[in-house]
């Protein structure tokens, strides 16, 4: 071979070797990057991960706390509205009875037939008691009933006209009422002894 050709081939080999070493260097850098983390680096990564989890849990807690606070405020508002407007249904059902009473009062001023006025008042009373029953109010029975201190309050004791009426209610001075089976006013009664 010609010395020129030898030189040329030698140069080509040098160029190829330079390329090979240049290609190997980045691989060495990549190998270093892919190398396992040191103990210190691993601990730092775990710490960062733990802090991220803590931040996430803290955010969830704050959101849940705010949601519960809003729920509490909303239920308090609803409860206050129920207390203020709870009797609205009952009052609304009584209003027609009040209208009937107003008409009866006007009629009484000019009426000459007392019997008709009495019948009108009795009709209004019956209508009112029906409205009360619709709202859960019931009259406590007293006639010929034995004294029951859960429902009755004995305000007087008198001698019983017969042996069968001893310990029983002879007269009701004031009617008692229950609301949804809870006594709201005891019946005031006279008992035989």
From Swiss-Prot:
Composition bias, Basic and acidic residues: 1-22
GO BP annotations, alphabetical order: protein folding
Pfam families: GrpE
Disulphide bridges, residue numbers: none
UniProt region (Disordered), positions on chain: 1-45
Keyword terms: Chaperone, Cytoplasm, Stress response
Primary location class: cytoplasm
Record field: compositional bias (Acidic residues): 23-32
InterPro entries assigned: GrpE, GrpE_coiled_coil, GrpE_head
UniProt subcellular location: Cytoplasm
Any Gene Ontology CC annotation: cytoplasm
GO molecular function: adenyl-nucleotide exchange factor activity; protein homodimerization activity; protein-folding chaperone binding; unfolded protein binding
Protein function: Participates actively in the response to hyperosmotic and heat shock by preventing the aggregation of stress-denatured proteins, in association with DnaK and GrpE. It is the nucleotide exchange factor for DnaK and may function as a thermosensor. Unfolded proteins bind initially to DnaJ; upon interaction with the DnaJ-bound protein, DnaK hydrolyzes its bound ATP, resulting in the formation of a stable complex. GrpE releases ADP from DnaK; ATP binding to DnaK triggers the release of the substrate protein, thus completing the reaction cycle.
UniProt family annotation: Belongs to the GrpE family.
Subunit structure: Homodimer.
Protein name in UniProt: Protein GrpE
Gene transcribed to yield this protein: grpE
């Amino acid at each position: 071979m010609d010395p020129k050709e030898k030189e040329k081939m030698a140069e080509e080999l040098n160029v190829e070797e330079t390329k090979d070493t240049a290609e190997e260097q980045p691989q060495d850098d990549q190998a270093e990057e892919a190398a396992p983390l040191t103990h210190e680096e691993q601990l730092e990564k775990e710490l960062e991960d733990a802090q991220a989890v803590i931040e996430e849990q803290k955010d969830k807690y704050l959101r849940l706390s705010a949601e519960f606070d809003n729920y509490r405020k909303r239920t308090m508002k609803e409860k206050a509205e129920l207390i203020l407007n709870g009797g609205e249904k009952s009052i609304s059902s009584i209003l027609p009875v009040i209208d009937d009473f107003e008409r009866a009062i006007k009629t009484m001023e000019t009426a000459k037939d007392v019997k008709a006025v009495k019948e009108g008042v009795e009709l209004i009373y019956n209508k009112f008691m029906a409205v009360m029953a619709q709202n859960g109010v019931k009259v406590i029975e007293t006639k010929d009933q034995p004294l029951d201190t859960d429902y009755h309050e004995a305000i007087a004791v008198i001698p019983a006209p017969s042996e069968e009426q001893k310990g029983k209610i002879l007269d009701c001075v004031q009617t008692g009422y229950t609301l949804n089976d809870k006594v709201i006013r005891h019946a005031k009664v006279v008992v035989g002894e």
